[in-house]
């Protein structure tokens, strides 16, 4: 009885890992986000937040890193005025914590995330550089991330490769705690 379910799970993992390779993928030779996120018209807010928190050095020099980058539309849906409040605050610790929750140490391509989920019976957990857990599971063909308070974000563009990292665009802002 156990063998058929194992075969089904392994087959599903194989098929899902193949589907990731069909997604759009970009490669940049520069280091991570500060030069390349701004190239995307839909990542202006996260670039502004990186500059405001002075996290450019971390992103340009550290690595390997995985960044789950919310689109501008995701930030706009996040909260009316909250992003502006965080960007304009003198104390940038809350904004820095929020950004840190979107970064995981290590080079996690979509296929590595899928393999971790296969090993975890459909679920995987990663520790962000902020120190909190970020869970991943599948919903159809999508990798879905879940934060500690239950918010979810889908990876909409996977494996934007950088010299020292990989970026996955997500459709929602995830949070380490309620803001």
Q: What is the predicted function of each stretch?
A:
Residues 1-10:
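Bacterial N-terminal signal peptides that target proteins for export
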């Amino acid at each position: 009885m156990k063998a058929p379910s194992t075969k089904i799970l392994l087959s599903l993992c194989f098929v899902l890992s193949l589907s990731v390779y069909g997604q759009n993928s970009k490669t940049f030779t520069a280091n991570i986000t500060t030069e390349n996120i701004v190239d995307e018209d839909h990542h202006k807010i996260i670039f502004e937040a990186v500059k405001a928190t002075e996290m450019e050095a971390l992103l340009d020099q550290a690595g390997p890193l995985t960044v789950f980058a919310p689109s501008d539309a995701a930030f706009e849906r996040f909260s009316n005025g909250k992003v502006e409040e965080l960007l304009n605050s003198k104390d940038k610790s809350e904004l820095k914590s929020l950004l840190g929750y979107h970064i995981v140490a290590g080079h996690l391509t979509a296929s590595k995330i899928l393999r971790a989920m296969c090993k975890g019976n459909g679920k995987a957990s990663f520790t962000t550089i902020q120190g909190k857990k970020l869970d991943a599971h599948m919903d159809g063909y999508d990798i879905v991330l879940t934060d500690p308070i239950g918010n979810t974000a889908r990876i909409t563009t996977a494996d934007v490769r950088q010299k020292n990292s990989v970026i996955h665009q997500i459709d929602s802002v995830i949070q380490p705690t309620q803001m």
